[in-house]
C-alpha cells in the first residue's frame, strides 16, 4: 500500500526554497514525508541500490532541479546514510509524475517503479522513477549523443558519449525503443 502525497504547487511542493513563504511549512512537511518515509521504503527495493543489506538512517536531497523537456521531471541527487557506514552513498534519482486520467494501460507498467501516489486537488497519480518513462530515457540518449550540458541546481549536468555510442545507437538514438529493466537481478 503506497503513501499518498498531496501536491499543492507541482514539483515545487517538495522543496521549501521553491515555494512562497506562506507555504513553506506545507513544503517542509511534504519534503520530510518524502525523505523520511517514502524514499527509505522505496530505495531498498531497487536493483541499483547498493545499501540493500544496511538500515537507512537518513536520506536527503543533495542537489535537484526541475527539468523541462517534453514534460517535467525532477533530476535529483539523493544522499543516503546507512547505519553501518560512516560515508554516505549518492544516487541519481530522476522522478516523474503520471496521472490516472492518462489511463490504466499507461499506469500499470509503472507500478513497480512507483515511490508514492500523488494527489493534486481531485486528480490522482503516481510519483515514479523517471528511468521507467520512455520519453525521459529517450531524452537522456539524445543529450548523450549531442554532448549536451544542462543547468542542475547550482551547477551543470554534462552528458557525453564515447565513439562506440554512435555505432551502437545510430543517428537517432532518441528513437530507440526503451526496455524497462527487471526489478531484481542476480549478480
Language-model segments: residues:
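Phosphate/pyrophosphate-binding loops and the adjoining catalytic core of nucleotide-dependent enzymes
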Residues: 2-187
